């Protein structure tokens, strides 16, 4: 197992590529101001301080995500291929492997209960349709016989 070695503002992990610097999430979280703005996108750390004033959506949008994992927000906006290419120039390293969430380790119950929610998704409308059918038939039959 690789053990991290401290190296100033980042960490190098033994056995990793020599050019990759790893940052702990605690360190990224400290860089959340206009003077120093870091964010994580897809497990990679970016220093976007110089880009704040150039961002088409305004610097406020970036500062809201500063010091945190902005992957979901970045993807929700639907950035162009040019924007993704531009992002590369702000890359400074990767999130330390021990800070990365394992894929499939989702603690969000709404995502883990897909079987449970799928039957409920269909059950309620079907019961509702049957109930409406009985009520319609009952009242329609009553109005026809009068």
UniProtKB/Swiss-Prot annotation:
Q: What is its main location?
A: mitochondrion
**Single GO term (MF):** heme binding
- Report the residues modified as Phosphoserine: 19, 33, 80
Where is each Cytochrome b5 heme-binding domain found? 20-96
Which positions does UniProt annotate for heme binding? Answer: 55, 79
**InterPro entries in UniProt:** Cyt_B5-like_heme/steroid-bd, Cyt_B5-like_heme/steroid_sf, Cyt_B5_heme-BS, Cytochrome_b5
Q: Name one Pfam family in it.
A: Cyt-b5
SMART domains linked: Cyt-b5 (SM01117)
Mitochondrion as UniProt keyword = yes
Q: Where does this one sit in the cell?
A: Mitochondrion outer membrane
According to its UniProt entry, one GO biological process term is: nitric oxide biosynthetic process
The record places propeptide residues at 1-11
List membrane-spanning regions: 119-136
- UniProt keyword list: Acetylation, Electron transport, Heme, Iron, Membrane, Metal-binding, Mitochondrion, Mitochondrion outer membrane, Phosphoprotein, Transmembrane, Transmembrane helix, Transport
Assembly mode? Component of a complex composed of cytochrome b5, NADH-cytochrome b5 reductase (CYB5R3) and MTARC2.
The text of the family note is: Belongs to the cytochrome b5 family.
Report the protein name in the record.
Answer: Cytochrome b5 type B
Upper classification of the source organism reads: Eukaryota, Metazoa, Chordata, Craniata, Vertebrata
